[in-house]
């Protein structure tokens, strides 16, 4: 953390205001020095930053959370480090308060409870789908944000609360009086599932949701022999009894697998079914006078049925008719051969009618070949392999040490992927998410729009590089056309002119006549002169995703293992190269390294593809 003229900085972010302290972070409102956009920084305390056990789990959780987006979850942009302290950069929100603060002196209507619980269930289902759990759901870990005066669920501690259970209790004991601390800890323990001290998972979250729903409806905790919600809210239209009691099951295996499906509204049809079920048993015990005790042949049944239908209007009786299949009727026994013969005139034609199979023409679907959108391919340049130098002695610390590497030959697209190319990929896959629910692109941050189900490119932007695309989208597109993303080493070698080792892709100097930077928007690809190797837009226009995970000190490892280095085996964020239309001149250097998490979306992020030599 730097101090400049009494202004607090964390990396490229200037602190504007303090927002408070959460369970695992100090939260501040900050502004990026260059792009002038506001973010919320969640700064880890030094004791957590120095804990290897916490940081190992922290890294895994951050990587998973960064890949998903939901209005009720923290939107992670990237993770950075300043000295020995880590901080998480998240999107700015309108401010939140804890659910306990929101409920102070307030009684929620059933509609408000339904709105909040449905949002909580939706967010947790998404978290559970990626293998995470919230843990420690209670009135202080669940927050609410406000939009147009409506309270909405917000979960700032998802994935971390269960890791810091002891820290939370210790903080409570150190603040307030002993009586207040004990009362608050007691209330927190009310939300814990029976197994939660040993196991933190989806089932524990489900139990806590049941406790929270009961508290919001009734105003007390479901402790001991508690009254069902239906007794406290007899006019409710929701099956709160079924939902809450299923969540509060002692055996975690029998709790609901899907919270959204468990919470359902009682329809009139369901209420009618409940009424019928309650009436069925008494009706079966009722006897109708003058009912024959002996079952006659089918013909007699018909005549008896006709007689019973001729009931006078003043006679009223409840009759319960128990349905039987026609097979059961047809095998009804008779007492004599004479009665059997008399029924043949009815039975045989009926059996013949039932045995007759209807003649239905077989439907044969006409096979039509589905026409898939075909890719628009980009011309590629062959980059000859060999030994090259990478890194810089006058750049950032992550560009050191300068060292030699060896690479085999490879092909590289002459320009970044354009909107007209990427839109064909979206039409082919039919979604803006991949099979793992990772966003490929966020249309509102791009120049592609969906209107009436069709994808439309904004006028004049067909030849512009696609933006708003994630690393997942870039990688999926490359796979779709039979290519891949370039490695960080390949990208730098191609940008620096191979063995020439240029400072900028355009040479030793660069100006605004040679590249699109420090401007207001993207430009069509190939609008500026090509590099010495015939590549366009290697400097400016859009940052380009690379295949590698980013590591601050990877060049030290690369210097020891120089043969076709491909980044660390895992990490928090992926590499971006080349600078963009917003960048300053220094960001356009061939050796400059940028990074962000693979799910990050930005109007300055694009990509180009590479291919191996076969």
From Swiss-Prot:
It catalyses: L-seryl-[protein] + ATP = O-phospho-L-seryl-[protein] + ADP + H(+); L-threonyl-[protein] + ATP = O-phospho-L-threonyl-[protein] + ADP + H(+). It holds the Pfam family Pkinase. It comes from the Bacteria. Residues 13-276 form the Protein kinase domain. SUPFAM superfamilies: C-type lectin-like, Protein kinase-like (PK-like). Interacts with PknD, interacts with and phosphorylates IncG. Belongs to the protein kinase superfamily. Ser/Thr protein kinase family. This is Serine/threonine-protein kinase Pkn1. It comes from Chlamydia trachomatis serovar D (strain ATCC VR-885 / DSM 19411 / UW-3/Cx). The gene is pkn1.
């Amino acid at each position: 953390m730097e101090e400049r003229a009494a202004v607090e900085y964390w990396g490229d972010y200037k602190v504007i205001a303090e927002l408070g302290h959460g369970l695992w972070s100090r939260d501040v409102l900050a502004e990026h020095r260059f792009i002038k956009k506001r973010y919320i920084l969640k700064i880890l305390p030094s004791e957590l930053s120095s804990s290897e056990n916490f940081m190992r789990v922290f890294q895994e959780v951050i990587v998973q959370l960064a890949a998903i987006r939901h209005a009720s979850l923290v939107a992670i942009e990237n993770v950075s480090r300043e000295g020995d302290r880590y901080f998480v950069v998240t999107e700015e929100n309108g401010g939140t308060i804890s659910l306990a603060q929101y409920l102070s002196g307030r009684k929620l209507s059933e509609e408000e409870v339904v709105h909040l619980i449905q949002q909580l269930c939706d967010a947790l289902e998404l978290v559970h789908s990626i293998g995470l759990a919230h843990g420690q759901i209670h009135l202080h870990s669940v927050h609410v944000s406000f939009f147009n005066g409506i309270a909405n669920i917000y979960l700032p501690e998802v994935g971390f609360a269960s890791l810091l259970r002891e820290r939370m209790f210790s903080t409570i004991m150190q603040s307030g009086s002993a009586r207040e601390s004990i009362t608050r800890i007691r209330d927190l323990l009310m939300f814990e599932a029976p197994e939660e001290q040993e196991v933190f998972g989806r089932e524990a979250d489900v139990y806590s949701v049941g406790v929270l729903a009961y508290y919001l409806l009734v105003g007390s905790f479901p402790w001991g022999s508690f009254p069902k919600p239906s007794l406290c809210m007899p006019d409710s239209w929701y099956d709160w009894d079924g939902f809450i009691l299923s969540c509060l099951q002692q055996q975690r295996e029998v709790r609901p697998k899907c919270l959204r499906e468990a919470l359902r509204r009682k329809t009139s049809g369901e209420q009618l079914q409940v009424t019928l079920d309650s009436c069925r048993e008494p009706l079966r015990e009722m006897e109708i006078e003058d009912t024959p005790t002996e079952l006659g042949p089918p013909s007699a049944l018909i005549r008896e049925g006709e007689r019973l239908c001729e009931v006078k209007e003043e006679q009223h009786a409840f009759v319960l008719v128990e349905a039987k299949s026609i097979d059961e009727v047809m095998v009804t026994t008779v007492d004599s051969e004479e009665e059997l013969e008399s029924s043949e005139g009815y039975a045989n034609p009926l059996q013949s009618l039932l045995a007759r199979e209807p003649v239905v023409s077989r439907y044969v679907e006409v096979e039509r070949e589905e026409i898939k959108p075909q890719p628009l391919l980009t011309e590629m340049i062959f980059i000859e392999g060999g030994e090259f130098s990478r890194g810089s002695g006058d750049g950032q610390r992550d560009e050191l040490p300068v060292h030699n590497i060896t690479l085999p030959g490879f092909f590289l697209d002459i320009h970044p992927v354009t909107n007209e190319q990427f839109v064909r990929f979206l039409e082919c896959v039919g979604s803006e998410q991949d099979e793992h629910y990772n966003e490929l692109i966020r249309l509102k941050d791009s120049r592609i729009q969906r209107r009436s189900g069709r994808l439309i490119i904004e006028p004049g932007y067909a030849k512009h590089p696609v933006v708003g695309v994630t690393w997942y989208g870039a990688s999926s597109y490359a796979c779709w056309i039979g290519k891949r993303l370039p490695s960080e080493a390949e990208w730098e070698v191609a940008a620096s002119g191979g063995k020439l080792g240029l400072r900028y892709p355009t040479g030793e100097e660069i100006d605004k006549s040679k590249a699109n930077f420090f401007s207001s928007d993207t430009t069509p690809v190939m609008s500026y002169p090509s590099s010495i190797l015939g590549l366009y837009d290697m400097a400016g226009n859009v940052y380009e995703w690379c295949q590698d995970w980013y590591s601050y000190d990877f060049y030290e490892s690369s210097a020891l293992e120089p043969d076709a280095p491909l980044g660390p085996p895992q990490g928090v964020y992926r590499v971006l190269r080349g600078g963009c239309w917003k960048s300053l001149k220094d960001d356009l250097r061939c050796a400059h390294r940028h990074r962000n998490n693979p799910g990050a979306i930005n109007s300055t992020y694009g990509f180009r593809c590479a291919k191996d030599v076969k």
